[in-house]
Design a protein with these regions (language model features):
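GHKL/Bergerat-fold ATPase module in large chromosome/replication-associated machines
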Residues: 36, 57-75, 98-101, 105-112, ...
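GHKL (Bergerat-fold) ATPase N-terminal catalytic module, capturing the glycine-rich phosphate-binding loop
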Residues: 1-109, 121, 144
């Protein structure tokens, strides 16, 4: 999570991602091999390509109060006190409305980002190597236990459930041992 000052510094300035500062501060502790991809992936402000409004709710570790950074991407931003049960950060995007068809019969459809698969694909494509876990609730299905009194004609029943899943790998393929990388990982890369 971030304090109000960190929200101001990291999100309030378009050209500042915090990466270079982090690299400088931590180079001595971690040696010269500090590999940094922006703390917020490839360009936090790219969110406004698909969102009409962005809200970041963040509570720094050890702080009693959370802070809320909000912007429509046009007229600045606000930072106010807010609430969050635990430390961490939530980024909430209000997607733009789908565009009407143009003369060529094409339109931008932002609702494609609302599918679980679409969102996971975007995260893995653009933020797979962010060093912090990016988690999302995913829908899964599992077989219910077979009742003890079920007959030979029993047909398995399934139930849907939600589970929090880490979507990004957090470790770039080039930082892994070759023995830990499967062929499918190479193919995807």
């Amino acid at each position: 999570g971030m304090t109000a000052e960190e929200l101001e510094r990291n999100l309030g300035t378009i050209a500042h991602s915090g990466s270079e500062e982090f690299k400088t501060e931590n180079a001595e502790q971690q040696g010269s091999d500090v590999d940094i991809i922006g703390q917020f992936g490839v360009g936090f402000y790219s969110a406004f390509m698909v969102a009409s409004h962005v809200k970041v709710v963040s509570r720094a570790y050890g702080e009693d109060v959370a802070h809320v950074w909000e912007s429509d991407g046009l007229e600045g931003y606000t930072i106010e006190d807010g609430e969050r049960a635990e430390h961490g950060t939530d980024v909430i995007l209000t997607l733009r409305e789908n565009e009407k068809l143009d003369a060529d019969g094409e339109a931008e459809t932002y609702d494609r980002f609302l599918t679980e698969w679409g969102l996971k694909s975007l995260i893995q494509q653009y933020s797979n190597y962010v060093r912090y876990p990016i988690q999302m609730m995913v829908s899964k299905s599992r077989q219910k236990p077979k009742p003890e009194d079920a007959g030979d004609d029993y047909k398995p029943e399934y139930e849907d459930y939600q589970e929090l899943e880490t979507v990004n790998s957090m470790t770039p393929i080039w930082k892994k041992r070759s023995s830990d990388v499967e062929q499918k990982d190479y193919d995807e890369f």
